Amino acid sequence: MTQRIASHSRKTAETDISATVNLDGSGTSAIETGVVFLDHMLTNFSRHSGIDVQLRCSGDLEVDDHHTVEDVALVLGKAIVDALGDKKGIGRYGWAIIPMDEALAQCSIDLGGRSYCVFRAEFQRPVIQGLSTEMVEHFFVSLSRTMNANLHLAVLEGRNTHHMIEALFKSLAYAMKQAVKVESTEIKSTKGAI
């Protein structure tokens, strides 16, 4: 099987980001975004999806975290879709419901080339370790856009904002693990392409 590894970078007046992913990795990561809680979430995503992620970002955090969070998602999504190649044989779909103490989150994903994100969650804390909680939804919307994926994410239960967000990222990780797994030699679409 061809190695499913890809890199992508993006440099603007607001951010300078580079990312490399290995879809058939072991969940190792080296992530440095300047946003401590985002680093923690992406490390969890890597570990639980089994996707190796190397990502470095220098952003205009003196303004706020918006550009960094959005652009990190855009670059990560592009690296993942590039690593998928023609998507031949992948599971395409994945889903997970993940608990973290009192929090319960779910994610369903379709890597079929149709970008759409539905997000349902409300957080009580406005910021956690540099990450504006309003940016959590924007992260997933931006990721789905460049990954050409249909994402449905929801927090079903929860009070602790940290637990709720971490359960969301872990549910994405386990859904991705299923969706990127090579299961056959066929393309899972009646169109013959995804």
UniProtKB/Swiss-Prot annotation:
It catalyses: D-erythro-1-(imidazol-4-yl)glycerol 3-phosphate = 3-(imidazol-4-yl)-2-oxopropyl phosphate + H2O. InterPro entries: IGPD_sf, ImidazoleglycerolP_deHydtase, ImidazoleglycerP_deHydtase_CS, Ribosomal_Su5_D2-typ_SF. It is found in: Cytoplasm. Transmembrane segments: none annotated. The keyword rRNA processing does not apply. PROSITE patterns: IGP_DEHYDRATASE_1 (PS00954), IGP_DEHYDRATASE_2 (PS00955). GO terms for molecular function: imidazoleglycerol-phosphate dehydratase activity. It comes from the Bacteria. Keywords: Amino-acid biosynthesis, Cytoplasm, Histidine biosynthesis, Lyase. Pfam families: IGPD (PF00475). One of its GO terms (cellular component) is cytoplasm. Pathway: Amino-acid biosynthesis; L-histidine biosynthesis; L-histidine from 5-phospho-alpha-D-ribose 1-diphosphate: step 6/9. It is an enzyme of class 4 (lyase). GO terms for biological process: L-histidine biosynthetic process. Its EC number is 4.2.1.19. The keyword Amino-acid biosynthesis applies. Belongs to the imidazoleglycerol-phosphate dehydratase family. This is Imidazoleglycerol-phosphate dehydratase. It comes from Chlorobaculum tepidum (strain ATCC 49652 / DSM 12025 / NBRC 103806 / TLS) (Chlorobium tepidum).
